[in-house]
């Protein structure tokens, strides 16, 4: 497995996932700021030219949710995703996708101080999204009680990012949830890798 990665980007979420899964993988450094990026070769991995990208057995793809789901399903022993026959599978997929389909749009809404028509917007609106998420992660510690999943990893990463840059309100439930996620050994390992990659610049 290869993770196409650039430090100090949202690719950190996928890096964290690889450390959480605990399986062998290689990091392929991608300089998204270099002239000529994305190359045609990289667009065969991720057509949008963004990071992260992922490749396994010669097949490449992008999108954080896809990477997290692929890795979680590839290694069921990690219990990072309910198996397809598990009744919780649908709920897991809902919250795994929530970061990309809802949290990211409403964070932009918050940053830009805009309020699109919540009926027409596919993500609803900021207040409704935050309330739904707060309800989902309460009482915790994770979406499915004591079982940490890839959905928790993605949500924890998104909340941490959003609160750091003022795009998500620092509700106590969010602060506590993100802190629990960041306390995981896999997060610490990913931070160490990130620091080493930054130092290479």
Predicted segments — roles?
Residues 32-33, 151, 195-196:
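Conserved beta-strand edge residues that scaffold enzyme active sites
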């Amino acid at each position: 497995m290869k993770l196409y990665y650039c430090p100090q980007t949202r690719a950190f979420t996928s890096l964290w996932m690889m450390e959480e899964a605990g399986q062998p993988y290689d990091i392929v450094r991608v300089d998204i700021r270099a002239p000529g990026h994305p190359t045609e070769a990289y667009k065969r991995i991720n057509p949008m030219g963004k990071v992260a990208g992922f490749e396994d057995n010669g097949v490449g793809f992008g999108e954080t949710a896809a990477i997290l789901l692929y890795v979680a399903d590839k290694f069921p022993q990690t219990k990072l995703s309910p198996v397809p026959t598990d009744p919780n599978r649908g709920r897991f997929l809902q919250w795994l996708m929530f970061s990309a389909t809802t949290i990211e749009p409403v964070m932009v809404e918050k940053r830009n101080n805009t309020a699109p028509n919540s009926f027409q917007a596919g993500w609803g609106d900021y207040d409704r999204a935050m309330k739904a998420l707060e309800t989902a992660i309460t009482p915790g510690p994770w979406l499915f009680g004591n079982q940490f999943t890839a959905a928790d990893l993605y949500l924890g990463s998104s909340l941490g990012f959003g609160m750091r840059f003022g795009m998500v309100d620092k509700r106590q439930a969010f602060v506590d949830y993100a802190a629990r996620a960041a306390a995981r050994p896999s997060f610490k390992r990913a931070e160490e890798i990130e620091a080493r990659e930054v130092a290479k610049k």
